[in-house]
Regions:
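Alpha-helical structural context detector biased toward long hydrophobic helices
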Residues: 1-244
Length: 244
């Protein structure tokens, strides 16, 4: 279902946004529901999430499981089998499968989706797209905390009122989601501008988001060819100046 949403549905949504007038509400409740599924799936299945599960969460979970298994043994067997039980490890593939089975059960997945679906959504059209388009990466949903500047879902948490999400749909369009308990979220709901299409003309804003998306990337960032060519030219110029 997620792969289907990333295909024709996303193309249709981008077309609808592109053809809509400025400052109108372009996201329906259905759109937000569909986008929430795409965004949560992207957050959960990127390598960074799997790495965090493997290195941070899995060891704590397994420690509790082992201790519980030991205490469930008859007293006469505890000392004999304690060490063997404490050395039990799941293969990495089983760790991933356990995580996906937990995260993508309907009740858990829907709960994560509802956290962001109920937020305040804005659709940003990039007026700088010709020379400064939105970038993306192999970790495409930018999760950041207002104020602290921390990025990444495991540094912030989806339920944190300070957490905002930024997700480029294409080089010219992105969605931003604010908690409905944040100042922006409360104001947006009160003013009735949830789902509003707005034009971003400030280059600094676009550059800030692009740099954070690159910073949050696991291995790869995806930069449109014209921007990439400019970066390569600048690197070459700096190299030549350094040599001479």
């Amino acid at each position: 279902e997620i792969d289907v949403l990333c295909g024709q549905y996303m193309e249709n949504l981008i077309a609808k946004i592109t053809l809509s007038r400025e400052r109108v509400d372009v996201l329906s409740e259905k759109d937000k529901k569909m986008l929430a599924k795409v965004i949560i799936a992207q957050i959960m299945r990127v390598p960074r999430s799997l790495e965090h599960i493997s290195k941070k969460i899995y060891p704590d979970v397994m420690k509790r499981v082992r201790e519980k298994a030991i205490t469930s043994l008859p007293a006469c067997l505890i000392e004999e089998y304690r060490q063997q039980i404490m050395e039990i490890e799941l293969p990495e593939q089983n760790q991933k499968e356990s995580f996906f089975n937990f995260a993508f059960t309907p009740e858990n997945f829907d709960r994560y989706c509802e956290l962001i679906q109920d937020g305040a959504w804005f659709v940003f059209v990039n007026a700088q797209r010709e020379h400064m388009p939105f970038f993306t990466s192999d970790n495409p949903v930018l999760v950041e905390a207002t104020g602290s500047g921390k990025i990444g879902v495991f540094h912030n948490g989806l339920a944190n009122p300070a957490t905002t999400l930024f997700y480029p749909l294409c080089p010219s369009i992105a969605v931003a989601i604010f908690s409905n308990r944040s100042i922006v979220g409360v104001a947006a709901k009160h003013l009735g501008i949830d789902g509003r299409k707005l034009t971003i003309s400030e280059p600094k804003y676009v550059m800030d988001k692009n740099l954070k998306i690159i910073e949050q990337a696991y291995l790869h960032s995806f930069i449109p060819q014209p921007c990439f060519d400019i970066f390569i030219d600048e690197i070459n110029n700096e190299f030549v100046e350094g040599v001479y």
